[in-house]
From Swiss-Prot:
It is an enzyme of class 1 (oxidoreductase). It holds the Pfam family Ldh_1_C. Belongs to the LDH/MDH superfamily. MDH type 3 family. This is Malate dehydrogenase. NCBIfam families: MalateDH_bact, PRK06223.1. Keywords: NAD, Oxidoreductase, Tricarboxylic acid cycle. Gene3D superfamilies: Lactate dehydrogenase/glycoside hydrolase, family 4, C-terminal, NAD(P)-binding Rossmann-like Domain. InterPro entries: L-lactate/malate_DH, Lactate/malate_DH_C, Lactate/malate_DH_N, Lactate_DH/Glyco_Ohase_4_C, Malate_DH_type3, NAD(P)-bd_dom_sf.
């Protein structure tokens, strides 16, 4: 049986971490791609040289030619410029939109049957543009946001309550940015909703709101600390979880930026929602009941994403 092929488009900090994780988990053979010739080849060689020590079987190669991604089963896209301190994800729009156009053309030509996971920011607009530029079916193109945002929320909650992260589930809806909507009543510790934990005196509503705000600012907090770049370990781990669910047909329930066709009252846009990911790509979008406040917060988030998509159309009218 042929091994799966994983193409990593963009070989920066996230790309290199993705390659290492995909190798350790033996998800398949790995191709690192980057327009900066030498970088993907060097990182591929370095990680490959760890395989005898780590004991994993995966072929790693690097290339600056899109032909190298031919026939990939999964493409994970991190190409583009990362955030610097003081930049919002949206400041990156013009630069990274042009990158998505090139990446979309490369995937369309060489890996039209791939499951594509986009990580490039501003996420919700970039994954929307990438799907249009590539022409791939919308259920085969997703954005990595919710898994990371939920993971941050889970960590902060586990630290607050001094419990294992494994026993914390968290629910985050909406765009990947300042308007994301972490939902407390759908988030649990050992199956107990956070709203009940407030009643039980484990945490005050005010403290919970602080944790929710820290989750929203999770990426910016790391950008501020690093000063020279943005997060890469947790984003890479999050994308690998999605890729693994697709490759192994796990049917994991994972929050992703998915293409909506009327769910939550949203059409032809990518927004963070709970999905089921299996061999068919996004096999299902799970539509939950929102109360009035949650609905208002979600619609505000949708509005922010819509504004970014409009800005994309102004730059590249072909996206309309």
């Amino acid at each position: 049986m042929a091994r799966n092929k994983i193409a990593l488009i963009g070989s920066g900090m996230i790309g290199g971490t993705l390659a290492h994780l995909a190798g350790l988990k033996e998800l398949g053979d790995i191709v690192l791609f980057d327009i900066a010739d030498g970088v993907p080849q060097g990182k591929g060689l370095d990680i490959a040289q760890s395989s005898p020590v780590e004991g994993f079987n995966a072929k790693l190669t690097g290339s600056s030619d899109y032909a190298a991604i031919e026939g990939a089963d999964v493409c994970i896209v991190t190409a583009g410029v990362p955030r610097k301190p003081g930049m919002s994800r949206d400041d990156l729009l013009g630069i990274n939109l042009k990158v998505m156009e090139q990446v979309g053309a490369g995937i369309k030509k060489y890996a039209p049957n791939a499951f594509v996971i986009c990580i490039t920011n501003p996420l919700d607009a970039m994954v929307w543009a990438l799907q249009k530029f590539s022409g791939l079916p919308a259920n085969k193109v997703v954005g990595m946001a919710g898994v990371l945002d939920s993971s941050r929320f889970r960590l902060f909650l586990a630290e607050e309550f001094n419990v294992s992260v494994q026993d914390v589930t968290a629910f985050v809806l909406g765009g990947h940015g300042d308007t994301m909507v972490p939902l407390a009543r759908y988030s649990t510790v050992g199956g107990i909703p956070l709203t009940d934990l407030v009643k039980m005196g484990w945490v005050t509503a005010e403290r919970l709101e602080e944790i929710i705000q820290r989750t929203r600012d999770g990426g910016a907090e790391i950008v501020g600390l690093l000063k020279t770049g943005s997060a890469f370990y947790a984003p890479a781990a999050s994308a690998i979880e999605m890729a693994e669910s697709y490759l192994k047909d796990k049917k994991r329930v994972l929050p992703c930026a998915a293409h909506l066709t009327g769910q939550y009252g949203v059409k032809d846009m990518y927004v963070g929602v709970p999905t089921v990911i299996g061999a068919g790509g996004v096999e299902r979008v799970i539509e939950i009941e929102l109360n009035k406040d949650e609905e208002a917060a979600f619609q505000k988030s949708v509005g922010a994403v819509a504004g970014l998509c409009e800005a994309c159309i102004n730059i590249a009218p072909a996206l309309k």
